């Protein structure tokens, strides 16, 4: 399946995702389960037959994901390779599409290209972007910045499920700015 779906957003990729809980949908389903009066049939239909909504922010993210991948490969990890949709063989109803994998290091890559990166530096995105502040925590220690993901955000769940599916213990979650062709890395460990 991973080879057949290497081109994310292909018809095969969409088909494989439509019949499974995915890394990107799991948090929405988990938090929905706490709803006092859930309409599961309606909720599941959102995943089986998703409406194709492509905002300018989503178009921007898709447009610059390849640039981000190449920048990461050049500056941080030349062993990273693309992969398609991968299912967890022990639990074939769940799967994920990490943006890359380094099988030698047991590491996956997840890329985010916030729209604010079109006109702003990576420093600005980290320190000022209200969208980024929802999922990124910045701690300063002895003048060094340390980044972590908010555990109560969909991106954290997405990364964790992708690591579980790929049987990897680590992830590099990158936030990319096309303005300066640069990124920051949030190193994420698998949370058993």
Task: Describe each region flagged by the PLM.
Residues 1-71, 75, 118-150:
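Charged, glycine-rich intrinsically disordered N-terminal tails and low-complexity linkers that flank
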Residues 76-98, 104-192:
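Nucleic-acid nuclease catalytic cores
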